[in-house]
């Protein structure tokens, strides 16, 4: 549900790629794609348009993520030079995934919202829909006077923020956490995961 790459050329075990622009935007930064049929072969993936991305300074010392099962993500050998991000890897299996950061699937997102909304004293409000027709949900937790807004994934490439949000929601809805109890008493939290 979050694939994003353009293959511009393939030569043996090397490929030149480009990151596709975000929908209805001139910006781009994130990628997520699968490579098949390269088990045991050292592959070189060159993303050639990184120099024109939304935040080219973010590629210095950056490491792409890879996974053989889409559950466990590790850092790939990655370098950035002259606007080109180069990923080199030798897959152990026939199918391997690469991503900007560990993806947070839309199914996992919906599960998180549903699980949190089922907790006591949590109100689910649908604020609207995304341009893809997905609900934009807000989870209201607590009843204190201080209004706190937390939101994740404002931009397409920000999947890492929802991993943080998952942990925050687990803490904030924990019935035995003293920290969560105090926050719920002092604040009304409006959370858009």
Q: Which residues make up each language-model segment?
A:
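M14 metallocarboxypeptidase catalytic domain recognition
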Residues: 1-193
């Amino acid at each position: 549900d979050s694939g994003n790459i353009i293959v511009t050329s393939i030569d043996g075990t090397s490929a030149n790629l480009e990151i596709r622009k975000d929908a209805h935007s001139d910006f781009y930064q994130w990628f997520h794609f699968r490579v098949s049929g390269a088990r045991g072969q050292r592959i070189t993936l060159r993303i050639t348009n990184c120099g024109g991305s939304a935040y080219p300074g973010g590629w210095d010392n950056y490491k792409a993520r890879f996974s053989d099962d889409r559950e466990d993500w590790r850092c790939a050998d990655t370098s950035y030079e002259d606007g080109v991000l180069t990923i080199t890897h030798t897959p152990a299996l026939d199918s391997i995934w690469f991503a900007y950061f560990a993806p947070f699937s839309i199914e996992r997102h919906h599960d998180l919202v549903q699980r949190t909304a089922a907790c006591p004293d949590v109100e689910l409000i649908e604020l609207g829909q995304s341009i893809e027709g997905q609900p934009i949900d807000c989870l209201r937790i607590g009843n204190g006077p201080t209004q706190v807004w937390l939101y994740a994934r404002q931009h397409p490439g920000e999947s890492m923020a929802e991993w943080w949000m998952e942990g925050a929601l687990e803490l904030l809805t924990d019935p035995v956490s003293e920290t969560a109890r105090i926050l719920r008493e002092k604040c009304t939290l409006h959370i858009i995961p």
